[in-house]
From Swiss-Prot:
Coiled coil: none annotated. The lineage of its organism: Bacteria, Pseudomonadati, Pseudomonadota, Gammaproteobacteria, Enterobacterales. It holds the Pfam family FAD_binding_3. The gene is cbrA. GO terms for molecular function: FAD binding. InterPro entries: FAD-bd (IPR002938), FAD/NAD-bd_sf (IPR036188), Geranylgeranyl_reductase (IPR050407). It comes from Escherichia coli O157:H7. Belongs to the CbrA family. This is Protein CbrA.
Length: 354
């Protein structure tokens, strides 16, 4: 049975960044359910916008995005729609429009060969025994069993590692539903849509490489019905759909209290969305995935005596920032306050008309 210093479950932005940063410094194995290349297999449903905080992370690491990761067009504002109040406002934003699946595969491609990576793999079981973490996974057509000193859960909203460490932990979840359509709008745009009759979260749209993507986060019970109802409402705001080319859905976490952020215990750690590190006001998670990976890298390499406590302490600033997003979310989803902000015209950039 092979033994490693670190076993990473999941190679989204958080897991890929950590594996790359630990390469050559610790013996690392990493498991991921995505394929190494191509569009077959799992791909994460996501609007695919790289926020300024994520961009700063790449600046610190000296990385530049390859052209095949960047999508067209690049949009500099978000059209914010309050459906009930029939209000639309434009706010400046500095996102980079990306192809999320290509981005994830590019992040994986940066992991050095010294890391043992298993693509298209499935983690079947984890447990702790004799001060080691045991991992059973299936890859390349057969089942394997390894041990590791440290276990890292970078496995997203439905994290197996989080469920094992915190079996009684409850965090609010939504079903994120997206559909892709052939682009029909004469001017591409990115939008953020609020309708409290549909969801107490929000919905979105983005123009990307000739497609119009429309999606949102909805209650788990009847999300599909609510999604369809909202699509019908959006015709009043000149949204054009047609026949869906592709439909996607996944679970997304929605932290709503301080206790929703969990970092791990017993030499196991959580990073990215698995830890609850996702913005409640925008559902943006890439920047927090990259930041938490960098924090954990630093902690693992320093090897403090109480290593889980050190990671918890080191993420305090990140958790405070995310708690601020919870407060912001409550403001944005409060109909009266949102209506007042939008009617005030604060930060709104009106579009010139011919």
């Amino acid at each position: 049975m092979e033994h490693f210093d670190v076993a990473i479950i999941g190679l989204g932005p958080a897991g890929s960044a950590l594996a790359r940063k630990l390469a050559g410094k610790m013996q690392v194995i990493a498991l991921d359910k995505k394929h190494q290349h191509g569009t077959e297999g799992f791909s994460k449903p996501c609007g695919g916008l790289l926020a300024p905080d994520a961009q700063r992370s790449f600046i610190r690491d000296g990385l530049t995005l390859p052209v095949d990761v960047i999508a067209n067009p690049q949009i500099f504002s978000v059209k914010t729609v309050d459906v009930a109040a029939s209000l639309t406002r434009n706010y400046q934003r500095s996102y980079i429009n990306i192809n999320r699946h290509a981005f994830d595969l590019w992040m994986k491609s940066l992991i050095p060969a010294s890391v043992e990576v298993y693509h298209d793999s499935l983690c079947r079981k984890i447990w702790r025994e004799d001060d080691k973490w045991h991992v059973i996974f299936r890859a390349d057509g057969w089942e394997q069993h390894i041990t590791a000193r440290y276990l890292v859960g970078a496995d997203g909203a439905n994290s197996m590692v989080r469920r094992y460490l915190y079996p009684d932990h409850q965090i609010r979840k939504y079903v994120a539903i997206q559909q892709w359509f052939a682009e029909k709008h004469p001017v591409p745009f990115y939008s953020c849509i609020f309708d409290n009759a549909i969801t107490d979260c929000y919905s979105w749209s983005i123009s990307k490489d000739g497609y119009f993507i429309f999606g949102g986060a909805y209650p788990m019970k009847d999300g599909q019905t609510r999604f369809t109802t909202l699509k019908e409402k959006m015709s009043a705001f000149q949204f054009q759909f047609g026949k869906a080319v592709k439909s996607e859905k996944c679970t997304v976490l929605f932290p709503s209290r301080w206790q929703d952020f969990v970092c791990g215990k017993d030499n196991a750690f959580l990073i990215g969305e698995a830890a609850g590190f996702i913005s409640a006001s925008s559902l943006e998670g890439i920047s927090y995935a990259l930041d938490s990976a960098e924090i954990l890298r630093s902690v693992l390499l320093k090897q403090p005596e109480k290593i889980n406590a050190a990671y918890w302490h080191a993420t305090r600033k990140l958790r405070l920032k995310l708690f601020g997003k919870i407060v912001k979310s409550r403001c944005l989803t409060a109909p009266a306050l949102r209506k007042w902000i939008m009617r005030s015209g604060m930060a709104h950039i009106p579009q010139l008309k011919d």
